[in-house]
């Protein structure tokens, strides 16, 4: 995609320079987003853990959801996958498929959401791609993490007789979506806000995942 295709400096390279390059400023492996790929050197004694989730407007989020919330949710559901493997996050790659009529302030809000959460979780952008499309708005993110070699939490270690433990409350996110759609009535205002927040912003349990490494026989993420 060229600048001429989208006009007004909102083409791929202009958007990368203005909105995405700053997200990679503190990530040496990203090489300033000036090359075709990132160069990542694994920490000695660590295994790399890769996770990818995609989100599509009207399927995984509402079309009127704030772009900041969409970006943060996209990052967090991937970080939750890393947490389920006992991994610490290192960075991420993001691919964005933007409808041709998507306003530039939506994209700016999306980048702002990524910036807010990458700062919160101490990571940075490694690379990605942007494409203009007839629609729908689609987003894909790959999270990269590390875990002590051979210590990744797997699903296949579960066995009959194991104690099953759940962190958090199952169903809060789904209830939050129903609340946003007006499908729940009579809810306390504070509870409704809490449920909607859980829908928008799942909490990656990175510290818990790390704590469970070497202790739990199996683990799975159910945040999304």
Language-model region placement:
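Helix-biased detector of long, well-ordered alpha-helical tracts
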Residues: 1-224
């Amino acid at each position: 995609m060229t600048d001429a295709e989208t006009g007004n400096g909102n083409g791929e390279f202009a958007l990368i320079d203005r909105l995405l390059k700053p997200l990679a400023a503190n990530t040496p492996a990203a090489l300033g987003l000036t090359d075709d790929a990132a160069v990542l050197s694994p920490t000695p004694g660590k295994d790399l853990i890769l996770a990818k989730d995609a989100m599509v407007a009207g399927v995984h989020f509402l079309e009127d959801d704030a772009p900041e919330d969409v970006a943060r949710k996209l990052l967090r559901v991937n970080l939750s996958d890393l947490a389920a493997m006992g991994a610490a996050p290192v960075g991420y790659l993001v691919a964005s498929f933007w409808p041709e009529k998507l306003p530039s302030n939506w994209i700016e809000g999306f980048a702002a959401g990524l910036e807010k959460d990458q700062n919160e979780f101490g990571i940075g952008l490694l690379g990605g791609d942007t494409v203009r499309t007839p629609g729908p708005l689609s987003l894909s993110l790959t999270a990269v993490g590390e875990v002590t070699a051979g210590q990744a939490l797997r699903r296949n270690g579960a066995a009959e007789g194991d104690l099953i433990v759940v962190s958090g409350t199952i169903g809060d996110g789904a209830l939050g979506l129903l609340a946003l759609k007006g499908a729940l009535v009579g809810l306390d205002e504070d509870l409704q806000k809490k449920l909607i927040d859980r829908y928008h912003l799942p909490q990656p349990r990175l510290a818990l995942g790390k704590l469970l490494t070497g202790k739990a026989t199996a683990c799975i993420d159910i945040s999304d």
